């Protein structure tokens, strides 16, 4: 009998450990991934009332959920090791800081945890059906589809799309963070995320050559660094092991997070291709002068009205990032008119220095440019720092040749203009000669009103 009571007491202790005061995302072991897991969806609610302590909610128990407020669902993807997403709590905190909302973390780790990707992929529609059942109960209590926002990561992006399809695209918004590519590439719209799944669909593609989806899936599709090989991520498996496989894929989440923290605002440029963007062909955003370019992340829907004027209401947008947070690059245009008798072909490096002595350098990442007499060449330059009062500019001209004569580039006029701050005065230099591979510093002046 004593053994029996001891056994019951131990069971009670185990039960009390399981029923946490603050429920957390399901944490599983790699063993669970090897043997596979049955689907079990838990909904963890965070609000400003309980932003550090989640509530388990379901179709009958709503906790602190207020149906009159915006409700954001965060849906994760494939979990091959069973661990919680490393970015999850940062995303929860950042979202609740920018807006008073209901934040629901969709925990389907039991189901997503498996070493066999197809098993997790096959459960995505089941997760979507469960979410629809919950949203139906929200609607019955007075919620509006306009106020439903879904953020889906990898497989979670397609789950969000499946939910949206069941409401005929009437959800307020879906954000896809590097939607999964394997098993979804080439699928018809009914089998993946699609622009018609919500009133507004924005997508960040950060790993299109491996785990992500390459083609556009939203009303606006952002391609940081062309959608491949993100700066700061390891280039080989020997540098960082498993991080090599997932770093590019996860970068979509960290870029989205940066838009919430407001350390800087990442501006993107609608363009047909990354190549055209890098060559400076897409800086007016396809809008009348003075209209803002789209912003990456949480505030991307500010561009919804501009997109509605397009037919179809879709666009691709490109931008470059720095290697680490805050990720912003500051864009300038460098307009150059030369007067060499002979054609020159090469690239330009530019360095800026402000009045305090701070410097920032940009290799103007373009294909070799042809400089012809009296023809203007416009180059897009990107810098890690934004220097307000530029006191000195340095230029280096290079043809890329290792041997042979050093050529000169004779500049009739160089003009520097900020894309991020068009109100700043444009800076010029007239009658300048660059010797190949030699840094040439000079003090710019405010451009004259009459230009060639």
UniProtKB/Swiss-Prot annotation:
Catalytically driven reaction(s): 1-hexadecanoyl-2-(9Z-octadecenoyl)-sn-glycero-3-phosphate + H2O = 2-(9Z-octadecenoyl)-sn-glycero-3-phosphate + hexadecanoate + H(+)
One GO cellular component term noted in the UniProt record for this chain: extracellular space
Pfam families: Lipase
Gene Ontology BP terms: lipid catabolic process
UniProt signal peptide: 1-16
Active site: 154 (nucleophile), 178 (charge relay system), 249 (charge relay system)
Record text on subunit structure and interactions: Interacts with TTMP/C3orf52.
Cited function: Hydrolyzes specifically phosphatidic acid (PA) to produce 2-acyl lysophosphatidic acid (LPA; a potent bioactive lipid mediator) and fatty acid. Does not hydrolyze other phospholipids, like phosphatidylserine (PS), phosphatidylcholine (PC) and phosphatidylethanolamine (PE) or triacylglycerol (TG).
Family membership noted in the UniProt record: Belongs to the AB hydrolase superfamily. Lipase family.
Protein name according to UniProt: Lipase member H
Source organism phylogeny: Eukaryota, Metazoa, Chordata, Craniata, Vertebrata
Gene it is expressed from: LIPH
């Amino acid at each position: 009998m004593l053994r029996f009571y001891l056994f019951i007491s131990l069971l009670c202790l185990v039960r009390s450990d399981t029923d946490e005061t603050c429920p957390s995302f399901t944490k599983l072991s790699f063993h669970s991934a090897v043997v596979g897991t049955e689907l079990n969806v838990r909904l963890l609610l965070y609000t400003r009332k309980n932003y550090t302590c989640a509530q388990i909610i379901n179709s009958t128990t709503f906790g602190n959920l207020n149906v009159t407020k915006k409700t954001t669902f965060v849906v994760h993807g494939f979990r091959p090791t069973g661990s919680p997403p490393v970015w999850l709590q940062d995303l929860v905190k950042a979202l609740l800081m920018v807006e008073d909302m209901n934040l629901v973390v969709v925990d389907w780790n039991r189901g997503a945890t498996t070493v066999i990707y197809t098993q997790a992929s096959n459960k995505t529609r089941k997760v979507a059906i469960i979410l629809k059942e919950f949203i139906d109960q929200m609607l019955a209590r007075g919620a509006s589809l306009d106020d439903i926002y879904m953020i889906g990561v990898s497989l979670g992006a397609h789950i969000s799309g499946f939910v949206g399809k069941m409401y005929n695209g009437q959800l307020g918004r879906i954000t896809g963070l590097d939607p999964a590519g394997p098993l979804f590439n080439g699928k018809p719209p009914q089998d993946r995320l699609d622009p018609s799944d919500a009133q507004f669909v924005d997508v960040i593609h950060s790993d299109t050559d491996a785990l992500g989806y390459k083609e556009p899936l939203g009303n606006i599709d952002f391609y940081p660094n062309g959608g491949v090989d993100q700066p700061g991520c390891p280039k080989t498996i020997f540098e960082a092991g498993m991080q090599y496989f997932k770093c590019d894929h996860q970068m979509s989440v960290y870029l989205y997070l940066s838009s919430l923290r407001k350390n800087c605002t990442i501006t993107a440029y609608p363009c047909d291709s990354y190549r055209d963007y890098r060559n400076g062909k897409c800086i007016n955003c396809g809008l009348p002068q003075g209209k803002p370019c789209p912003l990456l992340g949480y505030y991307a829907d500010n561009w919804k009205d501009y997109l509605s004027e397009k037919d179809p209401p879709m666009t691709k947008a490109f931008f470059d990032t720095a290697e680490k947070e805050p990720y912003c690059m500051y864009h300038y245009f460098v307009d150059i008119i030369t007067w060499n008798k002979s054609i020159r072909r090469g690239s330009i490096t530019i360095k800026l220095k402000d009045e305090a002595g701070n410097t920032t350098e940009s290799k103007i990442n373009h294909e070799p440019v042809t400089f012809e007499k009296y023809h203007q060449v416009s180059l897009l330059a990107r810098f890690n720092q934004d220097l307000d009062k530029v006191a000195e500019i340095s230029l280096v001209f290079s043809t890329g040749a290792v041997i042979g004569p050093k050529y000169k580039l004779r500049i009739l006029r160089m003009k520097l203009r900020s894309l991020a701050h068009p109100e700043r005065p444009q800076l010029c230099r007239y009658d300048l000669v660059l010797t190949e591979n030699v840094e040439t510093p000079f003090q710019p002046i405010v451009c004259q009103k009459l230009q060639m």
